[in-house]
Amino acid sequence: MSSIIRKVISTTKAPAAIGPYSQAVQVDRTIYISGQVGLDPSSGQLVPGGVVEEAKQALKNLGEILKAAGCDFNNVVKTTVLLADMNDFGTVNEIYKTYFQGSLPARAAYQVAALPRGSRVEIEAIAVQGPFIKA
């Protein structure tokens, strides 16, 4: 049986993990990206501006981790969006759709009781290194 690659992905352009986990882990060609909240990577603090700015920063952080893995948003096949308030669903969708063009990833969205650091939104993703062939 051949070995499978398992590699930790990290970048200083996204916030360091705030617990005992990796920013992302690559297994073979699949990248599992930990949930990203709207933390500023330089300060480690939640960005001001509520759910709009937090969603933008969370997706920016996600993009930097994708880049560190040799991917971009086109490589994302699944996301999970966690919201402190489901009433923010439409607002987050408006921001989310600006980051994903063409084939949209599968997605689930949930309202949760609380998120780290008082965040209003957290987004995790699974990506696969390409290239892809359209079927």
Curated annotation (Swiss-Prot):
It comes from the Eukaryota. Keywords: Acetylation, Cytoplasm, Hydrolase, Lipid metabolism, Mitochondrion, Nucleus, Peroxisome, RNA-binding. One of its GO terms (cellular component) is nucleus. It holds the Pfam family Ribonuc_L-PSP. InterPro entries: RidA, RidA_CS, RutC-like_sf, YjgF/YER057c/UK114. Its EC number is 3.5.99.10. The modification N-acetylserine is found at S2. One of its GO terms (biological process) is negative regulation of translation. It catalyses: 2-iminobutanoate + H2O = 2-oxobutanoate + NH4(+); 2-iminopropanoate + H2O = pyruvate + NH4(+). It is an enzyme of class 3 (hydrolase). Expressed predominantly in liver and kidney. Lower levels in lung and brain. The modification N6-succinyllysine is found at K13, K60, K67, K134. GO terms for molecular function: 2-iminobutanoate deaminase activity; 2-iminopropanoate deaminase activity; mRNA binding; RNA endonuclease activity, producing 3'-phosphomonoesters. Catalyzes the hydrolytic deamination of enamine/imine intermediates that form during the course of normal metabolism. May facilitate the release of ammonia from these potentially toxic reactive metabolites, reducing their impact on cellular components. It may act on enamine/imine intermediates formed by several types of pyridoxal-5'-phosphate-dependent dehydratases including L-threonine dehydratase. Also promotes endoribonucleolytic cleavage of some transcripts by promoting recruitment of the ribonuclease P/MRP complex. Acts by bridging YTHDF2 and the ribonuclease P/MRP complex. RIDA/HRSP12 binds to N6-methyladenosine (m6A)-containing mRNAs containing a 5'-GGUUC-3' motif: cooperative binding of RIDA/HRSP12 and YTHDF2 to such transcripts lead to recruitment of the ribonuclease P/MRP complex and subsequent endoribonucleolytic cleavage. Belongs to the RutC family. This is 2-iminobutanoate/2-iminopropanoate deaminase. It comes from Mus musculus (Mouse).
